Each structure stands twice: as structure tokens, then as C-alpha cells.
């Protein structure tokens, strides 16, 4: 490819053979890079997918763990989801199924594990009217989450 580049810089018309050689040389150079890029892209997708799974399984553990163990698995889940999110933002289109699935599961984590628990812990500090409004909203959130997760399971064939 370097030799053919030098030939083109002479500003002389290329023969058919030279044009074909130039085309083949650059096709081979670009083809090797495209192949390398596909491998890297595949690795990034797999990494994001497995980190998402890791976050999911820690989230499942957080649903049943208590005390110090719960805090540890919540932190591990957050870390895995966060790493997967950073990789997917950098290497995947916003519409990529892995990236979208990650967004859904990460939002479930925030709802089920962090936000909902935080809200429940504060319910006893509310006055009666606020308590009713807050519990209604929390129930609507839980209903939406149930709907979203059942839709995702249907789409996954499960």
C-alpha cells in the first residue's frame, strides 16, 4: 500500500494494472482494520452483556439479602451496571438491544433496590395526606415496573 501511495503522489496517470494494484492494496489494508474493529466491537458487546448479567444477579441477591451483606451486593450490582453502561455508551448505538436491555435493568435496579427502599424508609415521617399520595405513586411505579419486566420476559421468550 505504501508503494502504491508513492506512485499516486507522482501525479502521473495510472494504468489499469496500477489502479487495480492500488485498489487491492487499500482493500487489504482497510479489510484488516475492519476485521480488527469487528473483533474489538464484539468483545465490547460481550463485556457489556456480561457486566449487565453480573449486575442483574447481584440485584437478585440484593432482593433477599439483609444488613451488611445487602449493602455489599447492592454496591456490586451498581458497579457492574455502571461499568456496562459506560462501555455500551462508548461502543453501541442507543438502539442496540444490549444497550436497551441494560437501560431497562439498570432502571429496575434503581427503582427496586434503591429508590423504592429509600421511599419506604421515609413513609413513616409523612403526614396522612402525603402518605396516601406517596403510597399511591409508589404502587403505580411498582405496577409499571411489573408491566415492563413482564413485557421484557415475553420479548425474551421467557
Swiss-Prot record:
Annotated region (Interaction with SPATA18/MIEAP), positions in chain: 1-158
GO cellular component term, pick one: cytoplasm
Annotated SMART domains: 14_3_3
Post-translational modification: Phosphorylated by various PKC isozymes.
Site residues, Interaction with phosphoserine on interacting protein: 34, 59
Phosphoserine: residues bearing it: 48, 130, 150
One GO molecular-function entry: insulin-like growth factor receptor binding
Keywords: Cytoplasm, Mitochondrion, Phosphoprotein
Positions bearing Phosphothreonine: 72, 149
Residues bearing PTM Phosphotyrosine: 60
Keyword Glycosyltransferase in record: no
Domain of life: Eukaryota
Places the protein is found: Cytoplasm, Cytosol; Mitochondrion matrix
InterPro entries assigned: 14-3-3, 14-3-3_CS, 14-3-3_dom_sf, 14-3-3_domain
GO annotation (BP), single: regulation of protein localization
Pfam families listed in its UniProt record: 14-3-3
Subunit-level organization: Homodimer. Part of a complex that contains DSG3, PKP1, YAP1 and YWHAG; the complex is required for localization of DSG3 and YAP1 to the cell membrane in keratinocytes. Interacts with SAMSN1. Interacts with RAF1, SSH1 and CRTC2/TORC2. Interacts with ABL1 (phosphorylated form); the interaction retains it in the cytoplasm. Interacts with GAB2. Interacts with MDM4 (phosphorylated); negatively regulates MDM4 activity toward TP53. Interacts with PKA-phosphorylated AANAT and SIRT2. Interacts with the 'Thr-369' phosphorylated form of DAPK2. Interacts with PI4KB, TBC1D22A and TBC1D22B.
Function: Adapter protein implicated in the regulation of a large spectrum of both general and specialized signaling pathways. Binds to a large number of partners, usually by recognition of a phosphoserine or phosphothreonine motif. Binding generally results in the modulation of the activity of the binding partner. Promotes inactivation of WDR24 component of the GATOR2 complex by binding to phosphorylated WDR24. Participates in the positive regulation of NMDA glutamate receptor activity by promoting the L-glutamate secretion through interaction with BEST1.
Family: Belongs to the 14-3-3 family.
PANTHER family: 14-3-3 PROTEIN
Name by which UniProt lists this protein: 14-3-3 protein gamma
Species this chain originates from: Ovis aries (Sheep)
